[in-house]
Amino acid sequence: SQFNPAAQSPSGAVSLLQLMPRTAGALGFANLTRPESSIHAGVKYLYTLRGEFQQEIPVGERTWFALAAYNLGLSGVEKARALAGRMALDPNRWAGNVEKAMAELARRGGGVEGPRYGQALLYVRAIRSLYGSYRSVPSLALANRQGEPSA
């Protein structure tokens, strides 16, 4: 969105947090043009996705899976997890496991599916990188040690 509350992607995602209108509607948000509504809807959706992985994914890993699902969709992440298992990787760990399977799906994919996996992979990698950078800022690192939620 590049911080544009009126942004619309080629796939139809809208507003600051680039939600599909149908998804936002299912979460109870009809109008995403107000930044507050867009942010609230995006956070609620990410929280909902994180809950989808509650049973099998360790707590510290759930955010990465939820972010991939936010970008790609839950079924795409499940497909990558299944491939990770077939590749003898851990389907419940992101880095070096499902991440590798997603890269393989991006490499294999034809049509629109392959690039979507690649985009989701880059999306999660970018956020993980920023997260690492923010954690290294002394005041933020201190806040994290004092009980702020981790990944």
Regions found by a protein language model. Name each.
Residues 1-151:
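Catalytic glycan-binding domains that act on GlcNAc-containing polysaccharides
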